[in-house]
From Swiss-Prot:
Recorded name of the encoding gene: rps12
Keywords: Ribonucleoprotein, Ribosomal protein
GO terms classed as biological process: maintenance of translational fidelity; response to bacterium; ribosomal small subunit biogenesis
The name this protein goes by in its record: Small ribosomal subunit protein eS12
GO function terms (MF aspect): structural constituent of ribosome
Database matches in SUPFAM superfamilies: L30e-like
GO CC annotation: cytosolic small ribosomal subunit; extracellular matrix; phagocytic vesicle
Family in the record: Belongs to the eukaryotic ribosomal protein eS12 family.
Pfam families (UniProt xref): Ribosomal_L7Ae
Domain of life, per lineage: Eukaryota
Length: 136
């Protein structure tokens, strides 16, 4: 088989370069250890008590007062803030959905904001996300 191109195997340990994918995995790991507070009320309580270690805000939140409040509390208490483009995607990442038999998300509830109070294990995605936040 002289004309065949060499087959290059994908590296399974390839580092992630997309912060949204890394954020999704970090949220999933935090959900496993009950370290996520979802919604405005829980987020504001965690930000006030300074138990939040990372705040995530949906940029398409329909209430501008929510956005101002969360941004102000996060900056006042020096808690890193990441904005995601879609509140439906954030709701799916936060587990606010039903899964069908094919494990596809159904009936996704929009989530305007969430905070991570406890990270799961310190994975490569966690390290990448913290490095990304420190560069901002």
């Amino acid at each position: 088989m002289e004309g065949d191109a060499p087959v290059i195997a994908a590296n399974p340990l390839e580092k992630n370069t997309d912060p949204m994918v890394a954020l999704q995995k970090v949220i999933k790991e935090s959900l496993a250890v009950q370290g996520v507070a979802r919604g405005l009320h829980e987020t504001v309580k965690a930000l006030d008590k300074r138990t939040a270690r990372l705040c995530v805000l949906a940029s398409n939140c329909d209430e501008p007062n929510f956005v101002r409040l969360v941004k102000a509390l996060a900056t006042e208490h020096n808690i890193p803030l990441i904005e995601v483009p879609d509140n439906k995607a954030l709701g799916e990442w936060a587990g606010l959905c039903k899964l069908d038999k094919d494990l596809a998300a159904r009936k996704v509830v929009a989530c305007s904001t969430l905070v991570i109070k406890t990270f799961g294990k310190e994975s490569d995605d966690y390290k990448f996300l913290m490095e990304y936040i420190s560069k901002q």
